[in-house]
Amino acid sequence: MRVYQFCRPFQLFTYFLCYLLVFVKANKEKISQKNYQVCAGMYSKEDWKGKIDPFISFNLKKISGLSDESDPGLVVAIYDFQDFEHLGVQLPDEEMYYICDDYAIDIGICEEENRDEFIVQDVVYDPYTSTNRSLANPIMTFSQNEVGLHDTRYPIKETGFYCVTAFRSSTSTKFNAVVNFRNAYGQLAGTEINKLPLYGLLAVAYVVAMALYSFAFWKHKHELLPLQKYLLAFFVFLTAETIFVWAYYDLKNEKGDTAGIKVYMVFLSILTAGKVTFSFFLLLIIALGYGIVYPKLNKTLMRRCQMYGALTYAICIGFLIQSYLTDMEAPSPLILITLIPMALALIIFYYMIIRSMTKTVIYLKEQRQIVKLNMYKKLLYIIYASFLSVLAGSIVSSFIYVGMNTIDMIEKNWRSRFFVTDFWPTLVYFIVFVTIAFLWRPTDTSYMLAASQQLPTDPENVADFDLGDLQSFDDQDDASIITGERGIDEDDLNLNFTDDEEGHDNVNNHSQGHGPVSPSPTK
């Protein structure tokens, strides 16, 4: 039977399918009549040491719809991606013919001994280099119509990007199989193994940075701002989260993609949702002036910030749980039920941060508080630099592959793409957080800075300040620190951040009788 009609789109499709499949996340991949090709990066034992010799195996789990006992069922090819052009022969009518069957044998494009196998050409013309090209690595091809593990494994002698393709001999045939891309070092996919040492190093970096911050925290334990306590708690959380990420890759490399590993991944995603949400929350309260412009925020305002953060966290958790319950091979539009609210929640968070930061900077300019203003300017520079760094990583990676043909790009991209898409943003986040923590670290003057203003810059609004008032930070009601004697209706404070809610106008209004801030030690 002529089978090229089933294979006609193979050559063009291979380019795009393999590029999309370059990020195989597990070393065992399913293959079926719907998804008849899978690819993954593989390391040779020389490039990445391990206990076993790396290989690719094919295990047919289910097959049905065979016409008779002579039906070959599946025709399978295992090959290095750069050799895909060696599969099949172009007929005079410009159709590609891939399987060695009766018709192919009759017209002389393959031999009887290769019946029910892929047609393989040892030398082909390469249109990219305009030269003849030989096989880079052997191509293994066979047919199978019975359930079970194929006897022969494909050995990996060279590091590369390898593919497995399975064609049906009949459109009525249905099958399910598992392809095992087994590297020498363990169960992790080739695209993930570099994350294991990198996240280990990142965990060590977090521990060192946290130790340095903790030392400053302990040294000034009697002069701490609430914000600095938040930062230390988040430092501990981020350090633990990074260690958990490293442990995930280590366990997955040892155990494989088991049910326990999947549960662990859900747990890890919950931690990641907390990391994202609390990062936005910290930036929001800093943007509102917490800890530097004002020792504390109004209690109602702080509570509403916390409630909005908790709501965002719950939405992120819902999205993650739904994404794990959704079949990625058949995605459902129902995922939008949680995706859209999560996107909106983060956008609103970002808007509130930028708006609050802008108002705080304007207020500091009006009050001529140069030191605090410079701190907030540095924070803005850090945020902008982080965005530019992530963007620059994507641009640089794109330029690296400019000029490469499709085959070379796919062959090389799988080993480094993870760094730009996964690890680079994580590394930028680490640098940004450590920089912000260093900027707001406990010092001999940080407590006084939050409790005072640069009096000579605004002499008309100066009010007396007593060092004994420092103790009152812990004794006064949170709201009175911002609102002073006048007080303010808590219902006037909401997350729309009008002028009465951010505390800036509270200070300005009170300055009519007492200076630029309330009588409490916010001067």
UniProtKB/Swiss-Prot annotation:
Protein name: Membrane protein PTM1
Phosphoserine modified-residue sites: S480
Residues annotated as glycosylated: N132
Taxonomic lineage of the native organism: Eukaryota, Fungi, Dikarya, Ascomycota, Saccharomycotina
Phosphothreonine sites (modified residues): T483, T498
InterPro entries: GOST_TM, GPR107/GPR108-like, PTM1-like_N
Region feature (Disordered): 483-523
Name of the gene: PTM1
Predominant place of localization: Golgi
GO biological-process terms attached to the record: retrograde transport, endosome to Golgi
Acidic residues: compositionally biased ranges: 488-503
Membrane topology category: Multi-pass membrane protein
